[in-house]
From Swiss-Prot:
Domain TRAM stretches: 396-464
Functional note: Catalyzes the methylthiolation of N6-(dimethylallyl)adenosine (i(6)A), leading to the formation of 2-methylthio-N6-(dimethylallyl)adenosine (ms(2)i(6)A) at position 37 in tRNAs that read codons beginning with uridine.
Ubl conjugation found in the keyword field: no
Positions bound to [4Fe-4S] cluster 1: 28, 64, 98
Protein family (similarity comment): Belongs to the methylthiotransferase family. MiaB subfamily.
Gene field: miaB
Lineage, highest ranks first: Bacteria, Bacillati, Cyanobacteriota, Cyanophyceae, Synechococcales
Name the record gives this protein: tRNA-2-methylthio-N(6)-dimethylallyladenosine synthase
Positions with a binding annotation for [4Fe-4S] cluster 2: 170, 174, 177
Biological process per Gene Ontology, one example term: tRNA methylthiolation
Location in the cell: Cytoplasm
Primary site of residence: cytoplasm
Length: 464
């Protein structure tokens, strides 16, 4: 077994065996972007994408550990593949991502059929690690690693909308969150490297980019440079101005934001820069200040409301989405009701909700005031019902509006419709006109009159 080998330790020239591969991705947008990069590496090595995981010569699970149910799903998938490997010993079985980082070598002991366990900081090192596997080693790569600016060419899932990582890791210490221990410290990419990647995407006819970071407002804190006024000059705001002139890119998004660092200057930039879309994903997690303090979030509900007010004062129709956790340890009924009240007051377009799940090596996991599964289930159901009701009400404002929709493809459930997204990130289905000659290409922007709404999508017709 080789464990925690140095990233630059070259013990092979070229992988001797390739074949087909399959990647299953669990979790967040960061994982999706990492999976695209690993797929690009595998195809550069000579692998081809399998039609399903049961036919693949290499199966890779890019995992999430933010909640227990995400972990259990991975172990279920691994169990099936472990049985398959007994029948097909040549199968390569890889676990990447946050669960791999959290469990490390213990995952190799739990699932001895695994060939490679690699944390998210080793995405760029996949080829070298597989070379070590080819030499007959079982490999764990979970040591802290500097993430190279030499971003591997990704195999993009979309040909129109591209993920662009701008900062890795997280320096926050929220009491419930395992991310800092599995994603590592913040590492910002340099602006010129980011812009070069975006220019390449534009050259490949991409029309939209989403800048990604676990805590994207922290971008640049670890980079050198200050202005004459003493302000950091490499911030997310500065980056938006810097990349805005890339020709061919029509839309710019970013996620995920932290309320502690969401500034008026950033809001002003989003208002001034035409390509930056009017969609803001800003998790609030709880509507109660005492719970926020116990979560170590570093802001109050008053501050959060001020952020939303500042956004809507400049962009009244902006879409506001968020994350929320219910049944945090010790959360009283009154504190929980404060969260429901905030959802109603703000009028979110969408909220990703979860019941609290204890995570290893986090302070809240060992607190004695854990709530019962019954309470968790009831509160999660109630908040989900409210989120859907609020989203349904919010979407009604689009009726009869003319919205610009970026075409992403055909509706997979209805071939008579094309689908895309508005600038506010509303999924929109558009009936293909039958009475006129209508030709479209992926990446076209079309005007759509909205005539029907659902909680999380819109339907409309081409507006000529």
């Amino acid at each position: 077994m080789l464990t925690n080998t140095k990233p630059d330790e070259k013990i092979f020239q070229k992988n001797s065996t390739t074949g087909s591969y399959w990647i299953t991705t669990f979790g967040c947008q960061m994982n999706k972007a990492d999976s695209e990069r690993m797929a690009g590496t595998l195809e550069k090595m000579g692998y081809t994408r399998a039609d399903n995981e049961l036919n693949a010569d290499l199966v890779l699970y890019n995992t999430c550990t933010i909640r227990d149910n995400a972990e259990q799903k991975v172990y279920s998938f691994l169990g099936r593949q472990a049985k398959r490997k007994h029948k097909t010993p040549s199968l390569k079985l890889v676990v990447a991502g946050c669960l791999a980082q959290q469990e490390g070598e213990s995952l190799l002991r739990r699932v001895p059929e695994l060939d490679l366990v690699m944390g998210p900081q080793h995405v760029n090192n996949l080829e070298n690690l597989l070379g070590k596997v080819d030499l007959g080693n079982q490999v764990a790569a979970t040591e802290e690693n500097f993430i190279s600016e030499d971003i591997t060419s990704a195999r993009r899932e979309s040909s129109i909308c591209g993920w662009v990582n701008i900062i890795y890791g997280c320096n926050e210490r929220c009491s419930y969150c395992v991310v800092p221990s599995v994603r590592g410290k913040e590492q910002s990419r340099y602006p010129n490297a980011i812009k070069s990647e975006i220019q390449k995407l534009a050259g490949d006819n991409f029309k939209e980019i989403t800048l990604l970071g676990q805590n994207i407002d922290a971008y640049g804190r670890d980079l050198p440079g200050t202005t004459k006024e003493g302000r950091k000059e490499n911030t997310l705001t500065d980056l938006l101005y810097y990349i805005h002139d890339v020709k061919g890119i029509r839309r710019i998004r970013f996620a995920t934001s932290h309320p502690r660092y969401f500034s008026k200057r950033l809001i002003q930039a989003c208002y001034e820069l035409d390509k930056v879309c009017e969609h803001f994903h800003i998790p609030f997690q709880s509507g109660n200040d005492e719970i926020l303090k116990q979560m170590s979030r570093g802001y109050t509900i008053k501050k959060y409301k001020n952020i939303i007010e500042n956004i809507r004062s400049l962009m009244p129709d902006a879409s506001i989405t968020a994350d929320a956790i219910v049944a945090f340890p010790g959360e009283t009924e009154k504190q929980y009701q404060d969260t429901l009240k905030l959802i109603t007051e703000i009028g979110f377009d969408q909220v990703n909700t979860a019941a609290y799940s204890p995570r290893p090596n986090t302070p809240a996991a060992v607190w004695s005031n854990q709530l019962s599964e019954e309470v968790k289930k009831a509160r999660l159901q109630e908040i989900n019902d409210l989120v859907e009701k609020t989203a349904r009400s919010r979407n009604k404002r689009y009726i009869n509006n003319i919205e610009s929709v970026l075409i992403e493809g055909l509706n997979p459930k209805n071939s008579s419709q094309i689908m895309g997204r508005t600038r506010t990130n509303r999924l929109t289905f558009v009936e293909i006109p039958k009475n006129i000659d209508f030709n479209f290409s992926l990446g076209d922007e079309i005007d759509v009159r909205i005539n029907e709404t659902r909680p999380f999508s819109l339907t409309g017709e081409l507006y000529l």
